[in-house]
Amino acid sequence: MEKFEGYSKKHKFRHQYFVYPLLFQEYIYAFAHDYGLKGSESVEIISCNNKKFSSLLVKRLIIRMYQQNFWINSVNHPNQDRLLDYNNYFYSEFYSQILSEGFAIVVEIPFSLRELSCSKEKEIPKFQNLRSIHSIFPFLEDKFLHLDYLSHIEIPYPIHLEILVQLLQYRLQDVPSLHFLRFFLNYYSNWNSLITSMKSIFLLKKENKRLFRFLYNSYVSEYEFFLLFLRKQSSRLPLTSSGTFLERIHFCTKMEHFGVRYPGFFRKTIWFFMDPLMHYVRYQGKAILASKGARFLRKKWKCYLVNFWQYSFSFWIQPRRIQLNKLANSCFDFLGYLSSVPQSPLLVRNQMLENSFLITTRIKKFDTIAPAISLIGSLSKAQFCTGSGHPISKPIWTDLSDWDILDRFGRICRNLFHYHSGSSKKQTLYRVKYILRLSCARTLARKHKSTVRTFMQRLGSVFLEEFFTEEEQVFSLMFTKTTHFSFRGSHSERIWYFDILRINDLVKPFN
């Protein structure tokens, strides 16, 4: 416990230089245009009617808040000229965006400055490279096949937002900013049901996602920090086996001495008591713990995590959110794919002199499938098809030009193929392309009050080229013009693209 506290204090000490500017004493616009934020996201605020407000409006609002009489009136007389008026939706939405975006800009400054200072270093530490999403793809392709057990974790959200605010106290030395954050969260949301009642969440709207994303990332960063500590200390924790309390360090020392005289027994037994190498991968709100070794070690880690969230973050996590499965018999949802590692038999013919015989071996293969139900559900929600996948027209787009309609449908199709290009089976994607292509044809036919067959014949190859995906172009370049090439024949090929996070939200259904 003392080591845990010391490790935590060391972690806090690193962030003591993160002194946040006082929101009520400094002009935000001076920080918003700081050189450390030049490479980050734009600080412009987009309102509910698509009007853009610069950070200068944040400055004006803060100056207005400096006026003590106005602030007192807005609190003491909530129905008279108050700062956040629920009776006037525009002003409520407008001020909420300014305050949330302004606070997010302020708290992001130290992290941006830290990234800028790290970029000037000659060498980037290896563990920082492994934190990139790009490291997930080689892990799934190369190392995942050699593991045995999989723990699929749905990272829980804190039930009470006060937990998120308290986590910032470890890194924040600006108390007024914390009080302001509490005021903002309490004023704009139902404090006790912000996370549980998704439809009434005000902060999770698109206009306020920057602030909530910062709070969520702070929570995940704190959780992963302590998880790393538990992983480093796991080899030193005591182990209970057959009613005997064994100290791991001394036991392994004795086993090494015993293994000198009985090497065969040592190799078969020592793995049972030592923690194997564990791999941790996270994307958005889902994480994976995968490793080799005994099943009881995975159950031990499940118990660790349940107790960890209970005592470190003061809320109970349902054990069902941590699923423990054998990798060979499980299918898990990750990165928008349904992934599995099936074992398929492979017959190998061997020839020895005049005799030949067959040997059956089992090989593992990492299999990724684009989820048909969720993809069709997203298309149905966007009114491209029915719930059963039957294509329908898009009436709202009939006012656009023909080329705009073709471009929109083609771009959605290409983005879906681009995001799910890592799928080992493309049948679902071909079905999605068929839905979008026929929906586009019906939209054009509805616009011109004609039939689908007429427009298919009029546009011809131009209509098909709009749905010719980037992945098909890549594979077509691998073959010469004289070689017969059918993209359907290469349905098992996989290409991982690194820019999938910047694609439209439609390509990440229910994730």
Swiss-Prot record:
Molecular function, one GO term: RNA binding
Matches recorded under InterPro entries: Domain_X, Maturase_MatK, Maturase_MatK_N
Localization, UniProt: Plastid, Chloroplast
The entry's keywords: Chloroplast, mRNA processing, Plastid, RNA-binding, tRNA processing
GO cellular component, one term: chloroplast
Keyword Plastid applies: yes
Chief subcellular location: plastid
Task of the protein: Usually encoded in the trnK tRNA gene intron. Probably assists in splicing its own and other chloroplast group II introns.
Protein name listed in UniProt: Maturase K
Organism: Nardus stricta
